[in-house]
Amino acid sequence: MSRLSKDIDSAFQGVGTKSGLEIWCVYNKQLISIPKSSFGKFHSGNAYLVLRTFLRKIESPQYDIHYWLGIDANEVDSILASDKALDLDAALGCCTVQYREVQGQETEKFLSYFKPCIIPVEGKYSPKTGIAGETYQVTLLRCKGDHVVRVKEVPFLRSSLNHDDVFILDTASKVFLFAGCNSSTQEKAKAMEVVEYIKDNKHDGRCEVATIEDGKFSGDSDAGEFWSFFGGYAPIPKLSSSTTQEQTQTPCAELFWIDTKGNLHPTGTSSLDKDMLEKNKCYMLDCHSEVFVWMGRNTSLTERKTSISSSEEFLRKEGRSTTTSLVLLTEGLENARFRSFFNKWPQTVESSLYNEGREKVAALFKQKGYDVEELPDEEDDPLYTNCRDNLKVWRVDGDDVSLLSIPDQTKLFTGDCYLVQYKYTYKERTEHLLYVWIGCESIQQDRADAITNASAIVGTTKGESVLCHIYQGNEPSRFFPMFQSLVVFKGGLSRRYKVLLAEKEKIGEEYNENKASLFRVVGTSPRNMQAIQVNLVATSLNSSYSYILQYGASAFTWIGKLSSDSDHEVLDRMLYFLDTSCQPIYIREGNETDTFWNLLGGKSEYPKEKEMRKQIEEPHLFTCSCSSDVLKVKEIYNFVQDDLTTEDVFLLDCQSEVYVWIGSNSNIKSKEEALTLGLKFLEMDILEEGLTMRTPVYVVTEGHEPPFFTRFFEWVPEKANMHGNSFERKLASLKGKKTSTKRSSGSQYRSQSKDNASRDLQSRSVSSNGSERGVSPCSSEKLLSLSSAEDMTNSSNSTPVVKKLFSESLLVDPNDGVARQESSSKSDISKQKPRVGINSDLSSLESLAYSYEQLRVDSQKPVTDIDATRREAYLTEKEFEERFGMAKSEFYALPKWKQNKLKISLHLF
């Protein structure tokens, strides 16, 4: 919320209330709001202020302020833009990160807001005419950058051309792209995006496009026409060696504190610690290529403006004012780059009340007459892994890889490593998943052998398998529905593990059915139940879970105070699955008997606070390269599918899991090599978000992206299936050529709602005992023989079951192979109030328009008889744009998780 005072500019009234961009131009010594239609058009004679708002689901909003200074902007406007940036920060509660942007040296984060590029316009901004004295003329543009393109107008002369860059010649009837012979494929592809932008915005899509290859002239009419603009062809001279900048070693960061008069005082130490930063002072951290100004919470607005002016003056005296990035940080909002210069910067973890909030919303819907099972969890994957069809599990024991029988597939041991392969069909597209499951007590040699054997299996599927490296206890939620019911026992069957146990004399720690055992029961439904054996001590208990304590022919069930009703249902079913024939003794937390405590070795303290799951706020995409065993990464801001260039390797950091995407034309040729990159990324923890080496790492190849990867993009399958390099694909797309694909494209997962995704699966049969398994190809003779032997075990019947949408009561009986549907009482409200489908025609909803205040979840006068999961659809087009900052068509083109974030921020979900 804005926090305005009489000293804050009225232009900031109501800012920061919705996600997106807001832009102002300094005009006649005051701020003028720029209309959305002019976003991305910056004039070199002006200074601008740009606010980017991101309303997060759990934490407070994220604000980034950029003040952009044109190369011809006067000093008065530049200083005013800097001061107004601080005023805007104050209006937003002093919780922003501010960046100074100089024309031609903009940060990649700033450029990412205006894809594919910004092309500064000469002259000054005029609110009446837009551009003072603008006339169309032939221009020559130089493009630099392989992932973020920087466009600069250069003199329309042959001498402006060189062999290293890509140039665009924009004429009245044709746009030429000239590619220097030393330019990369990615640079040419990015420049082609600029060509498309120019064609659409300056020529209304009505002009020809031609590409000119440096050094190729004969027989090319387009090349002849291009050179005619320069008075005829002539060789381009090579750049002299003197123009090549030598790489200098980056000096250590130097910290200064800034007094109230603006004087800089060096701290005189190269070893920096957070305790050196005092709340009532401002500091400047000079990192040579970038400078940070840190402002304590107890400093005044005047002190902050003085410190910024002093830092800018420092850069001017150093001759670095146009080449050095300046970032302004308020105490408590330090970014990862700034923190990396300090020793052991303490991590602060914000507590999350997400689950409690969802429970309150569910209760509210229930009061309104809706069945809460109709409300999908936006973070869950569609239930494409709701049965054990085509599941195979191998146990790794040194050089031996043993295929497990069907009954043993659901029994894993903490001292072993396993390969879990699952093949399923989604929208007529076959998907392959191969997990490397690492037991928490497994031997390092077995872990290495597991990865090697997994790579062999992946090789036999021609790279189609998605490889995932997971540790016990850190499995992704989509791992468990493959098993439906899974038990993890302590101990192991590996020869190496048994030798280690014998050496350490820990034989008694293995599972023994004749001795007492404690199992933690986990799962949200009968589709993903787990019983995990834990240490037989009271400290293993946790109030958030339920437990089964087996001892001989008897059993206790312990129900934590913070466990849910679904936990209790899963507990009852796991008792049956564990084959506990006796009548269990139910104990609620706080009512334990002496016998119970004695079996656990006595009463002791255990965790009693609610465990919260980690939410994906905003994924981060990085391009990566590895040279001399050193991993180098660079973040791609505001990423889209087109950023995944086929020549590169990318890392998608989702905090709770990491994806390594391999372009088909990259120099990474094996998934084992890609997995190594992912593990190195975990070790680096670039964003200092608490990544551990146990974080799941997926390896995905281009053209075989699974739905749980593409959900983070506005995904178009046809783009991923095109042939050629990045430049050839862009050119073919621009010229409208029909391109061949690598394989038949799958359905667009992103555009499908979870309702429809699940509904599509209802027509599929659920195998009651894991039958209908496919043959798993393996590269070694041993693995091939295992696949052949498996065919002899697959002779069972399957019972088709029509599963209700979002129902949690499907139970597969492992003994008789019959799927049973537990009856549950449902409200008749659904019959009285038919729900509108997620893909129904928007016009039918718009005909029932309601005001925003009526549609809010917390409305005092709520509207009834609507689809509660699509409240935004009942807004008029005008009010929708006012609230969301975009048209409905743009909104529904966003990934589902982004839609839900916006709806939650506006109290519409």
UniProtKB/Swiss-Prot annotation:
Lineage top rank: taxon: Eukaryota
CDD domains for this protein: gelsolin_S1_like, gelsolin_S2_like, gelsolin_S3_like, gelsolin_S4_like, gelsolin_S5_like, gelsolin_S6_like
Domain called HP: residue spans: 844-909
Residue ranges, compositional bias (Basic and acidic residues): 752-762
Location of Phosphoserine modifications: 780
GO BP annotation list: actin filament capping; actin filament organization
This protein's GO CC annotations: cytoplasm; cytoskeleton
UniProt repeat feature Gelsolin-like, residue ranges: 29-79, 149-189, 262-305, 391-448, 529-569, 631-672
One GO MF term: actin filament binding
Keywords: Actin capping, Actin-binding, Calcium, Cytoplasm, Cytoskeleton, Phosphoprotein, Repeat
Entries under SMART domains matching the protein: GEL, VHP
Tissue: Expressed in all tissues examined. Mainly detected in the vascular tissue and the pericycle of roots and in the vasculature of leaves. Not expressed in the root cap.
Region (Disordered): 733-781, 816-835
Localisation per UniProt entry: Cytoplasm, Cytoskeleton
Family statement drawn from the similarity comment of this UniProt entry: Belongs to the villin/gelsolin family.
Biological role stated in the UniProt entry: Binds actin and actin filament bundles in a Ca(2+)/calmodulin-insensitive manner, but is unable to sever, cap, and nucleate actin filament formation in vitro. Does not protect individual filaments from severing by VLN3 (AC O81645).
The protein, known as: Villin-1
Species: Arabidopsis thaliana (Mouse-ear cress)
